[in-house]
Structure formats: C-alpha cells, structure tokens
Amino acid sequence: TGDNGIEADNREGDELVTPVSMPSIANMTIVVRDDQRAVRLRRGTGLMLFNSELLNGDTCLRIQGESLNLLGSGITFDGVQLDCATNVEGDDVDAIQSFLDSSNVAEGANPPPAGTLPADGFFEANSTIGADVDSWKGNWTFGI
C-alpha cells in the first residue's frame, strides 16, 4: 500500500528457504510521511544497513516473525540514525531494542559516528551518515 520506505520479505509460508533476502545498503536516507514506516522486515529477511538515516515517520523500524532470529547476524546496523515518533515496533520490541542498544545506532536528532563498511570493495569508505544530498541532487530532485 506504499506505507513503508522499505518493506522486505522472504518467501511467505517458507520463511527460512534459501537464498534469504539480505540486502546490504550504505548511505541511505529515508524520510517518510508521519503515517508511514521507514523500514519493515519480516518473513525471514535480513538487512545490513550502514551509515544511514531513518527519519520522520510514525515508526522507523518494524521487525516481525522469523526476521527476529537474524538480529545481530543477518540484520546488522552500523552508523544508523533513527528519528521517528516511535523508533521500534514489532513482534519482540525488547529484543529489537536490545539489538539497537548494542549497535552503533543513535535514536533522536543527533546521528551516531560513521560505521565501518564491509571490506569487500563494493562500498567506498566515507564519514557521512545518510545520503550526501547536497552533492548529488542537482536540478532533478524535488521536495528535498
């Protein structure tokens, strides 16, 4: 229904089937409307998120079902800022909050230090949290 910045699912009915959906994303900024979620993970999907911002929405992060079992292994956050009306919701809010508390994550208006990107050669090292909007938006974007 278009109410999530990212909604990621593995296979419904067989959530642990491989390959598991597990994107790696760095330097992303998601700004959603007040009635939306920034990220929703469910049905066994993972997410490696680095140097990113989840901002403005009703909820920053919702994790459900088999995805909860991936906290800290198939779900990792490093250098992530959560600043929404409610930062965390899901099937086990305490487990999600414990994961965030032990990660390089800041909740609120001040971003955390930049995280360490995977040394796989795909990402370029930088010290920016979120998208570097001013350097790339040019004349083709709006609302930023």
Language-model features, listed with the residues they occupy:
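Extracellular beta-rich repeat passengers
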Residues: 1-144
